[in-house]
Design a protein with these regions (language model features):
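Short, solvent-exposed beta-strand-to-loop segments that form ligand-recognition rims
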Residues: 173-191, 319-331
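Extracellular/secretory pathway-exposed regions associated with glycan biology
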Residues: 208-295, 364-383
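Short, aromatic/His-centered strand-loop micro-motif at the edge of beta-sheets
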Residues: 135-158
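Ligand-recognition surfaces built from glycine- and aromatic
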Residues: 186-224, 338-348, 355, 369-372, ...
């Protein structure tokens, strides 16, 4: 009897210990070893001489960035998923930001404050997420990843990033409601380093690797996914130089037999040329070709987003040309971004096969197009 009680007690003790261990390692519990409190000391950061200062500021150890476009890079960190929290007092007249999943200045994810909007919680572009791809910050190609936020200069602001696979939530001063919800991180990397830039102070940096607070790692829903009106497939030429001031005419149309490559649109119907061709050091252009098979003659309306300049030819005749260059006064709404709101034009289609040739030029940040017809009924997009 005593032996039976002993065995039962032993098994019960093992079971309780096992349950306790499972509880300690559950996803909702953060092991102490997983929380990285990053010291604001020079030995933990890589930076250019005299560009960063480490000090006590408002009673907390802080890092002060003294020079714009001179990131302070955290040493010995390979971050993929998890939570990043920090306090920031922005002083930059332009932007204060954090890079993550950073493998170089040319490839990383970037979240930033437009500090000119500090104190204006209704500014539509107060904060933005944008990746840097092939050396190009895609702020002008992804306007749906910006939004309002309540933050201020001359005081601490608390920022929390929750990053899980393809998704990210950004909290600013209010930890109950995200200021930005990013359904798909658009950068090329799944892991990398972390850095800060922009004049101002950084303090209380805490990183919790793999603590994602239940955020799904899967890509979120594309609001245009079920909309058949977008022209999501085209053929693409290679880029060629286009001297400043030169406009495209019918004499510039590509010749029969020129090499073409198939290109599929990204989320929201964006034909993103930056991801393929990278930065334009000087003005250059690419041709996009779309073939439409039409049952009967009809006129359609095209909602058209573009960056920077476009020339649209229908069946070898110039139909539409426009510019969306960020500098005023020729930038398009919304504020020079590539958006379906940029422009629209009539598209007179003949019965049979119609060929659209779209010249796209670029010499400033991102480039690409978005095209959506008012209806695709009676129209077939040919491969």
């Amino acid at each position: 009897m005593n032996k039976t009680i002993f065995v039962f007690t032993l098994l019960l003790s093992i079971r309780v210990a096992s349950l306790a261990q499972k509880h300690r390692s559950s996803p909702n519990t953060v092991p102490a070893a997983a929380e990285l409190k990053i010291p604001m000391t020079a030995d933990r950061w890589e930076f250019s001489p005299q560009k960063v200062e480490f000090l006590e500021y408002k009673s907390v150890p802080a890092m002060k960035i003294l020079k714009r476009n001179e990131p302070a890079i955290l040493k010995d960190l390979h971050f993929s998923n998890g939570t990043i929290e920090f306090d920031i007092e922005p002083e930059d007249p332009g932007f204060n930001g954090i890079y993550f999943r950073m493998t170089s200045k040319e490839e990383n994810e970037y979240f930033y404050l437009r500090t000119g909007d500090a104190g204006n919680p209704l500014a539509i572009d107060a904060v933005q997420y944008a990746p840097i791809v092939k050396g190009v910050l895609l702020w002008d190609m992804l306007p749906w990843y910006q939004g309002p936020a309540d933050f201020k200069k001359q005081q601490w602001n608390h920022i929390k990033l929750v990053i899980s696979g393809a998704e990210m939530l950004v909290y600013i001063n209010d930890l109950n409601r995200p200021a930005l919800e990013i359904p798909r991180l658009e950068g090329s990397n799944t892991e990398g380093g972390l850095a800060f830039d922009g004049l101002g102070y950084i303090a209380n940096l805490v990183i919790r690797p793999d603590v994602t607070e239940g955020l799904s790692p899967k890509e979120g829903f594309d609001p245009t996914h079920n909309d058949p009106r977008y022209l999501r497939t085209c053929l693409m030429s290679q880029p060629v130089p286009l001297p400043k001031g030169r406009e495209l005419t019918a004499d510039d149309l590509p010749k029969t037999g020129d090499g073409w490559e198939k290109k599929e649109a990204e989320r929201r119907g964006l034909v993103n040329l930056t991801r393929i061709f990278g930065k334009s050091e000087s003005r250059r252009m690419v041709w996009l070709k779309v073939r439409l098979k039409v049952a009967t003659e009809q006129q359609r309306r095209v909602a058209f987003g573009f960056s920077d300049e476009v020339w649209v030819f229908l069946n070898n005749k110039l139909l539409f040309a426009d510019k969306n260059i960020y500098m005023a006064p020729i930038r398009k709404e919304p504020d020079g971004r590539c958006s379906i709101e940029n422009a629209s034009f009539n598209l007179p289609l003949a019965a049979g096969i119609n060929e659209l040739l779209i010249g796209v030029s670029n010499d400033f940040y991102g480039w690409g197009i978005i095209a959506r017809l008012d209806t695709m009924e009676g129209i077939e997009l040919l491969p």
